[in-house]
Every structure is written in C-alpha cells, then in structure tokens.
Amino acid sequence: MAENDGETIVPDEQCNLTASTPMKSSGLEQVESPKERKTSMVECDDEGNPSSGTPDESPKQLTPHSIPPRRRRSPRRPEVSASRLPLKVLNQIFQYLPLKDLRSAMLTCHSWNNALSMEDSDIWQYLLGKKLPEAAVSDPFLLAELGSAKKKLRAWYFAWNTSDISRNNYIRTNGFTVHRQPVAQSTDGVRGKRGISKGVHAFDITWDGPLGTVAVVGIATKHAALHCVGYVALLGSDDQSWGWNLVDNVLMHNGAQLGVYPKMNNPPKYEVGDKIRLIIDCDTHVAYFERNSEFLGIAFNHIPPLRLYPAVCAVYGNTEVTMVYVGSPQMG
C-alpha cells in the first residue's frame, strides 16, 4: 500500500471493482414487490405517462350503504287523447258548440260520433232546454210525434221565421204557430227559417181556424212575395212560388192554375184539424202532399234546383197555421 500525499490509494485488483464490472445487487433488491409488478404492467401513452385508465391499487369494498338504491318505475299511464274522453266530459264540451261545429265533431272520430248519435243524450237535452221556448216545451201535443230531443231541436231550427213574415202576421210564443191579425183586404204569408236544396224533407202543417177565400200552402224561394193587397192566392202568383189552395183544391204556379189536386173527381175538401204533410224531394225535383197519412199524388214536378222554403199565405182574421219539421219521411 503506497501513500501519496497523505492519501491512501487502494489498487483496483484489491477492490475488485472496475468500470466494466457490474454492480451486484442483493437478493432482496432482485425480487419485485407486488406493487412494483403491478405498476410495471401499467400501459403508458405515447409520452410515457400512465394512461387515465390506471386501475386503483385495491378494489373498493361494496357495502349495503354504498349501493345506490334502484329507481322504482312508475306505472305506465294510458295516453290521454280527445277520442278517449269520457262521455260526461264530452257532453260538457259539446254544450258550448254551435250546431255546425257539432256536425263537424260527428265526423271527427267514432267516439264523438257515438256520443252525438244518441238523440236523447245530455247534450241534446241541454241544447233543447236552452233553445226551445217554454210554451213549446209545455205543449203536450205540439211535438208529440218527435220522440227525441235532437229531433225537437231540429224542428225548432226549421220553424217559422220571425224575420221573414208579412207585417200583418206574428209568430206565437211557441215559435211554431203563425197568427194572422184581422186586417181587411190583405193577403199575408210567412216562410220557414231554413231553405233546402238537397235531400227529401217533410213538414207537418195544421190549419187552425176558418180558411176564408184563400188558404194556400206550398213552397217558395227567398224572392217570393209575402204580402199583397186584396184576397189572392199569393203563393203561386209568380215564378218564385208553388201553392195549393185548400179552399178550391187548385194548384198554382207563375200565376196560372195547374189543375185540381188531388186528381180525382170531387176531391174532398180540407177540414179544420186535418194534418197536411208537405214533402219536398230536391233530388228528383218534385213536391207532393199527404193528408192524414194518405198520399195525394205528385203536385209539382220539374222544380228548378233552387233553395226552397216551406210557406203559407192566409186572408182570414185570427186564423193560425202550425208547422213542424219532421225530417226525412218514411218511404214505401
């Protein structure tokens, strides 16, 4: 061992350590711990950093308190649509609709159609009580042949028109009867509220009181006259009306007599209380009458396709004529 300036130099052979000799590690250093082994298997990204998906060191222990409660599914409610509304709800809604909208509602779906097809349902009873005058409701004979509330309400919309009438006539409080005031040298008429231009329609007409010299029942357009001076068959006096004079059983149109009606020898005269049914067939352009359910034959044919109204004219003072719309008549 040599000394150099007080420093002790150990030869390489004695140290047995050279730059080329690898350093031996202990056996403990060669064994990888589980943590190191696990870390060595971790995948890295391109930059050498552990990926975000590095698993935790130890799995979490699940406890009853750590498990989130399951959400209970609420029972599935049926879908609510207008076509599934209860009948009571529909009746409450339909009460506020006019007739034209009710007709549209009947064409909307089967449910609404079924609700409105019941002619005595609450909706029709409500509308009937709202529209029909008390005098008509309390009369046991006026609408006796109309069984349902819907038919009675429809008859009201086809009754005499208070705004389309001679100045010497007025409509009674029941809405279905016209009264002629005792005015001399005057012929006075009245038209129905609604005109018709298609389909078959029937009107029951009853004359209450003496007929006088002129008592005509028939049809007229909107342009036919409803008043004139003197006692004349006003209905049938021009090309806008067709009339049957119950006094002499003569048909009139355009100021000309078309013959006796019904076409038989010595036809029976009208008697007070007889029910005359006027039937207008707009599809075949004819009109005819029945008396006490007896068919009297075709009265007018080749009627032009115009909007027609039921009409009457009278000359006798204080006479009254009642008209009730019955809808489409029973054929055959």
Curated annotation (Swiss-Prot):
This is F-box/SPRY domain-containing protein 1. One of its GO terms (biological process) is proteasome-mediated ubiquitin-dependent protein catabolic process. The lineage of its organism: Eukaryota, Metazoa, Ecdysozoa, Nematoda, Chromadorea. Residues 138-330 form the B30.2/SPRY domain. Component of an SCF (SKP1-CUL1-F-box protein) E3 ubiquitin ligase complex composed of cul-1, fsn-1, rpm-1 and skr-1. Interacts (via SPRY domain) with scd-2 (via cytoplasmic domain). Interacts (via SPRY domain) with convertase egl-3 (via C-terminus). The keyword Manganese does not apply. Residues 15-28, 49-64 have a biased composition (Polar residues). GO terms for cellular component: neuromuscular junction; neuron projection; presynapse; SCF ubiquitin ligase complex; synapse. InterPro entries: B30.2/SPRY, B30.2/SPRY_sf, ConA-like_dom_sf, F-box-like_dom_sf, F-box_dom, FBXO45-Fsn/SPSB_families, SPRY_dom, SPRY_FBXO45. Gene3D superfamilies: 1.20.1280.50, 2.60.120.920. PROSITE patterns: B302_SPRY (PS50188), FBOX (PS50181). It comes from the Eukaryota. The gene is fsn-1. Component of a SCF (SKP1-CUL1-F-box protein) E3 ubiquitin ligase complex which is required for the restriction and/or maturation of synapses in GABAergic neuromuscular junction (NMJ) presynaptic neurons. Promotes NRJ synapse development and synaptic transmission by negatively regulating the daf-2/InsR pathway in muscles. By targeting convertase egl-3 for degradation, negatively modulates insulin-like protein ins-4 and ins-6 processing. May stabilize synapse formation by promoting the down-regulation of scd-2. Regulates axon termination in PLM and ALM neurons. It comes from Caenorhabditis elegans. Keywords: Synapse, Ubl conjugation pathway. Belongs to the FBXO45/Fsn family. Pathway: Protein modification; protein ubiquitination. Its main location: other.
